[in-house]
Amino acid sequence: MSFFKSSQPTIYIPDTLRNWPWPREINPHYEECKRESAAWVEKFGAFSAKAQKAFNKCDFNLLASLAWSRVNRDGCRIGCDLMNLFFVFDEWSDVSDAEETRRMADIIMDALYDPHKPRPTGEWVGGEVTRQYWLNAIRTATPSAQKRFIKAFKLYTDSVVQQSADRDKHLIRDIDSYFEVRRDTIGAKPSFAINEVHMNLPDYVMEHPVIKNLTAYCIDMLCIGNDLCSYNVEQSRGDDGHNLVTIVMHQLNLDVQGAFDWIGKLHDELVDKFLEEYKNVPTFKDKQVTKECAEYAFGLGNWVRGNDQWSFESERYFRKDGMRVLTERTVVLLPKKREPPPKPLDEDPIYSALPWWGWTALFGFLATAFTFSARQLSTRISANLIA
């Protein structure tokens, strides 16, 4: 039985992975790492109780354990923590303007560059989340993986700032320029650094044309898969400007189903390209490098499957209806919500951090403003009564 009951149109989601050879795999350390990572991120109080409950239903630890199904326990925990960090930033930036998102991005990167430095009192919580995440990760991550992760995470945070700027301007990009930004906002590049978290892959491997092509195809498939699954909830709350479905509808003058179908065909082309290129995964004189290169390439293919499975198995996009949608591929288009999305915290985080003298000044200003507004309102009411 469908979870959604409505007179709204029904959308068919293309079965993009019908020919994908990677099966569903889950890391054997999932349950243990989920408990630890969920408790870890919850202790920061980054969300209100209501928002935290919704956050937990998304089960980002499941995404990590599906995507990094073959890393060891340390790698699984690093992956779970990273997914939780990603979505702390994601949830906060979704309701912030570009200026505020830039401030948060700078805090994150400062914590990555120097995780041994204590974070300032009263700072946005993401700084301490990042610092603790990276302190744990660098205990076992190889130097090459650390270097690539930090470089990729800078691209990611910068792109999220750009996404906020686009949202501030109500900008709808064209398909090409959208992909330029989306390839970083998806967070795949730093995630792929966790594929190699305990490997020692030289730069010449990562710069090999085959590996670069596989990485590019994988990123685009992740962008498409995420946008197809997230579109319904995003459009319902008016936050679909950074979604390929909206971009395609706008540029190609298609309806929702037409855009889904067009995007499905694009994904089919990427599947064909990836599988053909996968036959050419390079070998090297160093047997260990060849082994790790093959494992890295396998991990790219597994990421596509893992991300898709999580989209349906978690409650982030389809609530409890995900497994039916995975099989039947249909969803009812949700009606538009009138209210804006809630802040991650019940209170405004800026006001909650004010010292006593800040509160005094704020209340003084509000009292003055209220008195002035009340006088204006009284004058207008009197004028209306006289008229």
Curated annotation (Swiss-Prot):
Residues annotated as site: Plays a critical role in the stabilization of intermediate cation: F87
Reaction catalysed by this enzyme: (2E,6E)-farnesyl diphosphate = Delta(6)-protoilludene + diphosphate
Gene Ontology molecular function, alphabetical: metal ion binding; terpene synthase activity
InterPro entries the UniProt entry points to: Isoprenoid_synthase_dom_sf, Terpene_cyclase-like_2
Motif placement: DDXXD motif: 90-94
Top EC class for this record: lyase
EC number: 4.2.3.135
Binding site for Mg(2+) 1: D90
Binding residue positions for Mg(2+) 2: D90
Keywords of this entry: Lyase, Magnesium, Metal-binding
GO BP terms, alphabetized: isoprenoid biosynthetic process
Residues binding Mg(2+) 3, per UniProt: N226, S230, E234
Binding site for (2E,6E)-farnesyl diphosphate: R316, Y317
Gene3D superfamilies in the cross-refs: Farnesyl Diphosphate Synthase
Required co-factors: Mg(2+)
Family affiliation: Belongs to the terpene synthase family.
PANTHER family: BETA-PINACENE SYNTHASE-RELATED, TERPENE SYNTHASE
Domain comment, as recorded: The DDXXD motif is important for the catalytic activity, presumably through binding to Mg(2+).
Role according to the record: Terpene cyclase that catalyzes the cyclization of farnesyl diphosphate (FPP) to delta(6)-protoilludene.
Protein name: Delta(6)-protoilludene synthase
UniProt source species: Cyclocybe aegerita (Black poplar mushroom)
Gene it is expressed from: Agr7
